[in-house]
Amino acid sequence: MKSIITEYINEDKRYQELNEVFGKENVLVTGLSGAAKATIIAEKYLNSEQQLLVVTNNLYQADKLESDLLQFVEDSEIYKYPMQDIMTEEFSTQSPQFMSERVRTLTALAQEERGLFIVPLNGLKKWLTPVDMWKSHQLTLNVGDDIDIDEFLNKLVNMGYRRESVVSHIGEFSLRGGIVDIYPLIGKPVRIEFFDTEVDSIRDFDVESQRSEGNIEHVDITTASDYIITEDVLKHTKHKLKQAYEDTRPKIEKSVRNELKETYESFQLFEAEMFDHQVLRRLVAFMYEQPATIMDYFKEDAIIAVDEYNRIKETETTLVTEIDEFMQNLIESGKGFIDQSFLQYEGFENLLKPFAVTYFTLFTATMPVQLNEIIKFSCKPVQQFYGQYDIMRSEFQRFIQNDYTIVVLAETETKKERIQSMLNEMHIPTFIDTPSRRNEGGSAIITEGSLSEGFELPYMQLVVVTERELFKSKQKKKPKQHKTLTNAEKIKSYQDLKVGDYVVHVHHGVGRYLGVETLEVGGVHKDYIKLQYKGTDQLFVPVDQMDQVQKYVASEDKSPKLNKLGGTEWKKTKAKVQQSVEDMADELIELYKAREMSVGYKFGPDTAEQNDFEIDFPYELTPDQSKSIEEIKQDMEIERPMDRLLCGDVGYGKTEVAVRAAFKAVMEGKQVAFLVPTTILAQQHYETLIERMQDFPIEVQLISRFRTTKEVKETKEGLKSGFVDIVVGTHKLLGKDIQYKDLGLLIVDEEQRFGVRHKERIKSLKNNVDVLTLTATPIPRTLHMSMLGVRDLSVIETPPENRFPVQTYVLEQNTNFIKEALERELSRDGQVFYLYNKVQSIYEKREQLQMLMPDANIGVAHGQMNERDLEETMLSFINHEYDIIVTTTIIETGVDVPNANTLIIEDADRFGLSQLYQLRGRVGRSSRIGYAYFLHPTNKVLSETAEDRLQAIKEFTELGSGFKIAMRDLNIRGAGNLLGKQQHGFIDSVGFDLYSQMLEEAVNEKRGIKAEKQDAPEIEIELNIDAYLPAEYIPNEQSKIEIYKKLRKIESETQLMDVKDELIDRFNDYPIEVERLLEMMEIKVHALHAGVTLIKDVGKQVEVYLSEKGTTDINGETLFKQTQPLGRTMKVGVQEGKMKVTLNKTGNWLDSLKFLTKSLEESMVITDEI
């Protein structure tokens, strides 16, 4: 992956001199800054065959370095060992992203692979599993291997995998019959099928559908944790822990000895089958006879580079002090033990002693070792031009006069062309991509790429310029291909029922789901869904009627009242809701008609300026953004006024879509009003528009409290005269005193946050102006159906490419953690949201934090402040006048502070899932990694739902996947916003799904649209045979319900075959009860196509009844021929004008019934409908 830059560097004498000693002797290299240093390191790696390690000060520096190295080295060869501060990593439940990267790195090292390894100081000093033990737990399975299954499953547990009944998350495995499913930390989920002890087949499978996707010949299974814990390790840990407990007990206050005993006993309880790696990792110091560090994993000839030695040394001193304090606190509070360390205490340079080390520092500094050589480079930063044409031209001409080669990095082909035409106008000799031939100096080469900054190497006569210097755009992070978590943790349908969930039975009302039970009725076994109603009432619903039962979903965490079986209460409730839904449908139909009649302005196709404007956008659009822009432009180009809702998660790029629509309107001489709910948002949107429109003659103005009376007056005059093209503002824009010369587009941000009066004004504008509404609250898809034609909808569900998943930690509240998280964010010049949801003591909380962080500026924001103070506080935070803001949930919506990338939430267990998700959306909104710490009180036993909630938010670190979880809670909120507050009560009384269904039916009925066929026509099959899914075959109730649902929907033999394949694929060969169930389904398929309505078992016979239509469509002659093999066991008659076929139950009568129903199907006269 050679690049033009490294070609130039490779020919340089200074570099060649360094190359000679790099990795062979102790060397000091000075003078190189960020990107230039990365270039030198990359070139060394590309010119050698060895492993190369770079030690950085912290994870932030490691990330920066990685971004630059990706420009030169294939991403498959770069390995980062991401370590946060050690205590947070060891004491919290955390998201799997970092863990998978660490495991990938250790595995590559254990297999002695060549690579470029980046390790922050914390990772270098951390205690690890001994190398040999790690190597012995890397599993490779091939088809045909003979293995001891028990030993294999034990190894998985040692490696950190958890045994579950169904595999749905990373780090889980399950055993069903002879099938083992595993979801490794790296790679796809795999299904291994055994024939006795032989590996019969290995298949990839999809966790969402649980179906296999294709056969593979072998699979490598990496560990699911960065520690291996075998039974021997567990014994050794308990033994060492006992010693540590006995050493610690006499040295602490008597008052906390009980606490220490509890801590000790909770660890001693762990058994090999059920221990939790996440908890036991705290005892790493007691685990191994000889713990390793990452340096033990490197080959002897590895090349070592240290980035800014003095800075690392400083960090190390602080780190050791902090950990000492932290451990002291733990010991004094009875939560920790003497000698319970997490890292190697000696200076980090001792770990590097066996190797020759190259130290990079910007300035000359004293080193801890005897240096063999000092090599000085001279490197200058490139001036920031930020689009200032004249400065750029004079600087570029200086380079040309001095015979420099200028390498300009552009991130896309379009940008390359744009930069080329710009340089041509400056008369600079320009080439595009000439990697192989060395140009003479005095010219520019434009090539695709991206670095964090440009640099000038005067003695090489080389300068590298990036888009950052040219246009102020940020470096786009190259996505790394080996991230395995993309869409891996998709949420299963929210309809998954768990015992104890509330459900709605269409005819009986709200009950509670108690599970699936197999009952014997009249000597026959069948599965039933058991529901609890008011008092002791219970209802058993046969699984073939399960479509009448839906999960109850309503406002978050709200428990409904159970209905009484057989009472009138449910009927009354449904009647009320029906009436409300009818009225709602009338209103929607009226809106639809009015909209179809109204006439607006028809915009023309895109102009050349539009194209230029769109090319200027520094990032790639996501597919959803492109689609939304396309839909909006199509709306604008027709006569009917646009009324489109653009729905997308926080920070997913809705603003850019709106800005492009605004530009299109202005290009045709129309004015645009951008209406937002708060002054701060107005300010932020205004700044975005100013920045995006700066190269075009477009007048953007703002009307808000932050403007003087004179400025507001001038803006109003400008709107009236047509001088102002775009105005941004709060509800003031809707005032009667605002007159537009020619308003063509109204953009409304978060319409639901405006009052009734303002909404009415917006509605009146909709009659002849194009309206685009933006919202971050997901709107339920079920409601899209009923709203169809009333309002158009665009959805952005994919995140922008260079946003990282927010690293999420769930941990007990602890002052040390908090201090550390604050210090780390402030040390990278970032800001922190500290969420404390108790207004009465919020100022005390600020004082506590001020004592922890005396040098930080800390602000407070809460909903009881007056609006002006609140806005000014938030604005100060946005402008970085505060480092930390202690706030209530008021930050949940709308404020965009890209520089705030740490969120700490106290008492996170008290929040609902959607709230936690939306709050977490406040951070990780730039190209930096965001961190969210969800704290819960120490010693508090979390309720099961709180635990589930925190677990869910932790697992769904993948961007946009939280959108899927929160969908449930937010949908209801969205439904209320869309349909009006008064509908909320009705949604809660019957549950969200039944409400949506009723509304859709009402709207369709009024529009004369026939409801689509939801399920197969009902055929009653009553046969006295055991036909069900036994618990021994499918132990997991959720999986059982899922299969029953699929069986209910079967309408063809192909679908039946598909379910048969799935059963064998997931659960292995099926028993006789399942075989009979599938035979009944086959009978149902044939009967369905033959117009059969009922198949009934009556003693020694089975009766088959046809519908009137089925009777008339049967060709009697064909049927007679087809059924001859059945002979006298079959009789055909007619009852009330409908055919009735009687079959004697002799021999294998179930096969005869299959044959009969198939013959009936084949004897049908083909008509258009069944």
UniProtKB/Swiss-Prot annotation:
Keyword set includes DNA repair: yes
GO cellular component: cytoplasm
Gene3D superfamilies in the record: 2.40.10.170, 3.40.50.11180, P-loop containing nucleotide triphosphate hydrolases (3.40.50.300), Penicillin-binding protein 1b domain (3.30.2060.10), Transcription-repair-coupling factor, D7 domain (3.90.1150.50)
Keywords for the protein's UniProt record, in alphabetical order: ATP-binding, Cytoplasm, DNA damage, DNA repair, DNA-binding, Helicase, Hydrolase, Nucleotide-binding
Localization terms from the record: Cytoplasm
Single GO biological process annotation from the record: regulation of DNA-templated transcription
Pfam families to which the protein is assigned, alphabetical: CarD_TRCF_RID, DEAD, Helicase_C, TRCF, UvrB_inter
Domain Helicase ATP-binding residue range list: 635-796
SUPFAM superfamilies to which the protein is assigned, alphabetical: CarD-like (SSF141259), P-loop containing nucleoside triphosphate hydrolases (SSF52540), TRCF domain-like (SSF143517)
Enzyme class: hydrolase
Gene Ontology molecular function: ATP binding; damaged DNA binding; DNA helicase activity; hydrolase activity
Domain Helicase C-terminal residues, every copy: 810-971
Residues noted as binding ATP in the record, renumbered to the chain: G648, D649, V650, G651, Y652, G653, K654, T655
Source organism, top-level taxon: Bacteria
Motif DEEQ box: positions: 749-752
Entry function: Couples transcription and DNA repair by recognizing RNA polymerase (RNAP) stalled at DNA lesions. Mediates ATP-dependent release of RNAP and its truncated transcript from the DNA, and recruitment of nucleotide excision repair machinery to the damaged site.
NCBIfam families with a match to the protein in the record: mfd (TIGR00580)
HAMAP family: TRCF (MF_00969)
Family of this protein: In the N-terminal section; belongs to the UvrB family.
Protein's name in the database: Transcription-repair-coupling factor
The species this protein was found in: Staphylococcus saprophyticus subsp. saprophyticus (strain ATCC 15305 / DSM 20229 / NCIMB 8711 / NCTC 7292 / S-41)
Gene: mfd
